[in-house]
Swiss-Prot record:
Highest taxon, organism lineage: Bacteria
Record's protein name: UPF0434 protein Tola_2233
PANTHER family in the record: PROTEIN PREY, MITOCHONDRIAL, ZGC:162634
Gene3D superfamilies tied to this protein: 2.20.25.10
Disulphide bond pairs: none
Family: Belongs to the UPF0434 family.
Length: 62
């Protein structure tokens, strides 16, 4: 089972309320604005600020 792409249309970053992009390779939802990656565990996004991973500029998707 994979992350439902319809879900990406309605979920938002819990901090800035901006769009999240799915990084399938790392199984994370990425917020470019806040430079954070939220884990996706068992196809469920974990959108908790304390579980977010800070991203370096070079890790951000294009």
């Amino acid at each position: 089972m994979a992350l439902d792409y319809k879900l990406l249309e309605i979920v938002a970053c819990p901090i800035c309320k901006g769009k999240l992009n799915y990084d399938k390779e790392r199984s994370e939802l990425v917020c470019r604005a806040d430079k954070l990656a939220y884990p996706v565990e068992d196809d469920i996004p974990v959108l908790l600020e304390n579980r977010a991973r800070p991203l370096k500029e070079e890790e951000l998707p294009l």
